[in-house]
Amino acid sequence: MSVSPVAIVSTPVAAPESSAAVAVPPVVVRWRGVEPYETSFDAMRAFTDARTADTVDEIWIVEHPPVYTLGQAGDPAHLLVGDSGIPLVKVDRGGQITYHGPGQIVAYLLLDLRRRKLTVRTLVTKIEEAVIETLAAYNLASVRKAGAPGIYVASGVHEGAKIAALGLKIRNGCSYHGLSLNVKMDLRPFLAINPCGYAGLETVDMASLEVAADWNDVARTLVRRLIANLDGESAAADTPHALEHSND
């Protein structure tokens, strides 16, 4: 799920009127378990369409069965095989093609950017920082890369390999879609695509980097870092993180 100035699909919204500062309700975290991609996609759009000015922002933590997703302006030619046996879903986020599957954390960010007084670029930066901080907690150094959206390995044998991807849709000033972080996956499906439109781009997971991380622990760390960057460290400390990972 790549994100860049051209990988963020948005609908125009009027600038908010200036007003006194209003407290922003803390983000609600929901663990949706192992869920078909189409179910999450439909639920995100329904949630966003039904939002009011009082709707509390949410982060959804999900794990998907194998699926390729192609962004709104994506080129199907980036799927390199005719019949991979893995479904392809065309979606309304920005970016090109990516893969989701077991062992990957997917976080969907359903946020009111106007209420939070966030630009899209600032939101992207906060998401990227949360991923970088999460990986740092496991002694993995990672970086952004100019012109190639996502989070990449900073050094070593796999320097430059992609470990996390981002993609957003902004509708009426509210975001959906989000990020994916590879923990311990079967990486072979990435070989059948040009990940996020980049031919030959290596994709890795934390296990490839010799980090035996528990999916639940990484998910909790990621949630804490996302909330800390959005709502502050104190909010992150007070947020329940009772996430349970299942392979069912």
UniProtKB/Swiss-Prot annotation:
Biological processes, Gene Ontology terms: protein modification process
Record's subcellular location: Cytoplasm
Keywords: Acyltransferase, Cytoplasm, Transferase
Any matching Pfam family: LplA-B_cat
GO cellular component, one term: cytoplasm
Top-rank EC class of the record's enzyme: transferase
E.C. number: 2.3.1.181
Residue ranges of the TM segments: none
Pathway: Protein modification; protein lipoylation via endogenous pathway; protein N(6)-(lipoyl)lysine from octanoyl-[acyl-carrier-protein]: step 1/2
Active-site feature positions: 196 (acyl-thioester intermediate)
Catalytic activity entry: octanoyl-[ACP] + L-lysyl-[protein] = N(6)-octanoyl-L-lysyl-[protein] + holo-[ACP] + H(+)
Binding site residues for substrate: 93-100, 165-167, 178-180
Domain BPL/LPL catalytic: residue ranges: 53-234
Site note Lowers pKa of active site Cys, residues: 162
Any one GO MF annotation of this record: lipoyl(octanoyl) transferase activity
General function of this protein: Catalyzes the transfer of endogenously produced octanoic acid from octanoyl-acyl-carrier-protein onto the lipoyl domains of lipoate-dependent enzymes. Lipoyl-ACP can also act as a substrate although octanoyl-ACP is likely to be the physiological substrate.
Note: In the reaction, the free carboxyl group of octanoic acid is attached via an amide linkage to the epsilon-amino group of a specific lysine residue of lipoyl domains of lipoate-dependent enzymes.
Family label: Belongs to the LipB family.
NCBIfam families to which the protein is assigned, alphabetical: lipB (TIGR00214), PRK14342.1 (NF010922), PRK14343.1 (NF010923)
Protein name: Octanoyltransferase
